[in-house]
Amino acid sequence: MLIPSKLSRPVRLDHTVVRERLLAKLSGANNFRLALITSPAGYGKTTLISQWAAGKNDIGWYSLDEGDNQQERFASYLIAAVQQATNGHCAICETMAQKRQYASLTSLFAQLFIELAEWHSPLYLVIDDYHLITNPVIHESMRFFIRHQPENLTLVVLSRNLPQLGIANLRVRDQLLEIGSQQLAFTHQEAKQFFDCRLSSPIEAAESSRICDDVSGWATALQLIALSARQNTHSAHKSARRLAGINASHLSDYLVDEVLDNVDLATRHFLLKSAILRSMNDALITRVTGEENGQMRLEEIERQGLFLQRMDDTGEWFCYHPLFGNFLRQRCQWELAAELPEIHRAAAESWMAQGFPSEAIHHALAAGDALMLRDILLNHAWSLFNHSELSLLEESLKALPWDSLLENPQLVLLQAWLMQSQHRYGEVNTLLARAEHEIKDIREGTMHAEFNALRAQVAINDGNPDEAERLAKLALEELPPGWFYSRIVATSVLGEVLHCKGELTRSLALMQQTEQMARQHDVWHYALWSLIQQSEILFAQGFLQTAWETQEKAFQLINEQHLEQLPMHEFLVRIRAQLLWAWARLDEAEASARSGIEVLSSYQPQQQLQCLAMLIQCSLARGDLDNARSQLNRLENLLGNGKYHSDWISNANKVRVMYWQMTGDKAAAANWLRHTAKPEFANNHFLQGQWRNIARAQILLGEFESAEIVLEELNENARSLRLMSDLNRNLLLLNQLYWQAGRKSDAQRVLLDALKLANRTGFISHFVIEGEAMAQQLRQLIQLNTLPELEQHRAQRILREINQHHRHKFAHFDENFVERLLNHPEVPELIRTSPLTQREWQVLGLIYSGYSNEQIAGELEVAATTIKTHIRNLYQKLGVAHRQAAVQHAQKLLKMMGYGV
């Protein structure tokens, strides 16, 4: 819940000097990316911008405090300020900020700019007190903001120092409007106007000019002089002389003498107590100060000119001028030290009553009240956890004594989930074990079950499925039906364990159950996770179309709940890329893989390993070995600089071994084979993939017997576990083994099985990747004309893809080849004396590649009758009577030229 006063522009006060000369300069602010107002405290930055903002509608205002260094809090308020300016135009960003569903501030801002692209009016965003930001991540994000913000948006930043926002670059490009302390300083005329408004007896222009010069036009000094002159008999000039040369860091003595010592004791205590509040309203003031009518008291303080300012148009929220507020807080620690804990407790209670637990925690921490802090956490911690207030929770839990956590195991569980969310798996188990050792009877009942659910999640994340299964089952046995979150966690873990064990049907049912529970209780990240798992299972079972439809449901969930920036989004677009690759939709597969990299742009480069492997796979399927090599260099660098799950390593190894196969790099394959992991089992698609990598390397090295043993065992496991996609892949690799070993009938047998199974999986690129050896076999099958209709159609499609991407279309019959052929000593005399035209050579190449007459006409973009003429002519020149004879003749020519066909 956001504090309204932080998003309210300060109300323009009566008796303030209208800074006409500065307002004139600000009138052109819409021509700049950034309007920067910088000066020490008390020069009137906020007052000036509130005057400028008066009457503007398309403006958002965000007043910072120290707590805004937390990235999530900064994002929530900044987006809320934009929503304020645009009347709710950026709904997607607002939801993402509220639910913390973004990868980083920069990615959230990128989405913001997409939404703002449809906002065409001038737009202003004011950020006040930016000097309070010390978080370098926020600085970097705001530099990104300024670089990419729409042309119609102007950012207005108020700061006591020069912020780290790339100011020099903006200045060079004339995109910066600057107002500094010299310009903010009051002129003689403005000082005269100021005193005329504040003092009952006007002073001479010469006198006010001297006073203005004495304090160098510092607005706060002028205000203090006017206050002092009203409260006692000191002349304004005497006060000015005392303030001359003084600056904000040396005001304490003056403020004590001239302000605090000149108010009654009740007002003094009111000022000191209320100053602990960063913002205040009637209820807060009444509770903290003990005075009955807080609103009336605030208005009275405002009338006295005691540096209090309204924060909203309703007049409900107030705050002290930062300079005066800091002074009062320091004095409060001196003068009311004994009462201060109780004052903070009162503030915490009032904030809680108004529904702001994070503000209440701030005061409970300041009070050092562990019991109050414990009670707030017991009631609100999980809500704060779900809103990613992780830093605040961690600070709060550290402030509680261990005994307090033991008395409230829910807080131990919370601390453990915090560790889990930060991938500190070892610390989770250590914490829970310590708690179980010291808490009586914890090993029974609901809390123990919740511990086990979390432990199960840690175990599966840490690659220990057996332990995860044991713990998840224990949790589900002990958890009451109403403990939905832990039940969702345990059910999801159990489904993932069964997936790892190859029990796909049972795993699918549990993941569907997880999805149903997660949707029912709005636990959207587990709903998304379960859909991704369902898609992977369906893919493994060979039901790629159903996997596609499940992915569509996941994309819809992401759009509805604005989950685009969760890391899981990358998982989804990656498995979509795998599916598109299987169907030979390579451009779309590449685009999906690149979008996955974009989702992870704010994370460590190692996280991009799987998407990078997918990009390499696309290059290999296209036969683009140069691009694949360039990408492989990066992939191998990432592999050497990170620790990865075995599934990730298997996928990375897959493209490496494929590349070595396509380039004939036996040395690299042999070296890899000596060092790579040899899994104990092959009962899921992760392990099947690694063993397939091993078999492919063995085939490249001519170790056919070893590879056959591996592949036959893989097929046995795949058939028993119904891993149909893996079976399809295994059959294709077995086909290559038989083909290279000269076992042509076995090769044809398993190729027919693979084509038949592909009617279910839809595989195309898995055939294409095997290149010319696959093309030769498919040509023979097509020419035999014995394939069933579906397999015939698929074989032709695969052949077209191979010809397109692996350059077998004209590669053997281009002009250079024909010239060399005609000069070959063994070339048939018929070809030498009656040579084919270049077009006829192209047609012969396409006939050899398995193209029909219609397909050749389409490829060469000529009429079918023209193709028939070319074919008739080349048959006559070659001395052949039919298509099969032409193919055989072309094959002889290729062998003569040294091509292994």
From Swiss-Prot:
InterPro entries in the record: P-loop_NTPase, Sig_transdc_resp-reg_C-effctor, TPR-like_helical_dom_sf, TPR_MalT, Tscrpt_reg_HTH_MalT, Tscrpt_reg_LuxR_C, WH-like_DNA-bd_sf
Domain of life: Bacteria
Residue ranges occupied by any HTH luxR-type domain in the UniProt entry: 829-894
Residues annotated for ATP binding in this entry: 39-46
Notes on how activity is controlled: Activated by ATP and maltotriose, which are both required for DNA binding.
One Pfam family here: GerE
SMART domains, sorted: HTH_LUXR
GO BP term, example: positive regulation of carbohydrate metabolic process
GO molecular function, one term: ATP binding
Residues of the DNA-binding region: 853-872
Keywords noted in UniProt: Activator, ATP-binding, Carbohydrate metabolism, DNA-binding, Nucleotide-binding, Transcription, Transcription regulation
UniProt entry tagged with the keyword Cell inner membrane: no
SUPFAM superfamilies linked to this entry: C-terminal effector domain of the bipartite response regulators, P-loop containing nucleoside triphosphate hydrolases, TPR-like
UniProt subunit comment: Monomer in solution. Oligomerizes to an active state in the presence of the positive effectors ATP and maltotriose.
Family, as annotated: Belongs to the MalT family.
Function: Positively regulates the transcription of the maltose regulon whose gene products are responsible for uptake and catabolism of malto-oligosaccharides. Specifically binds to the promoter region of its target genes, recognizing a short DNA motif called the MalT box.
Protein name per UniProt: HTH-type transcriptional regulator MalT
Species whose genome carries this gene: Escherichia coli O6:H1 (strain CFT073 / ATCC 700928 / UPEC)
Upper taxonomic lineage: Bacteria, Pseudomonadati, Pseudomonadota, Gammaproteobacteria, Enterobacterales
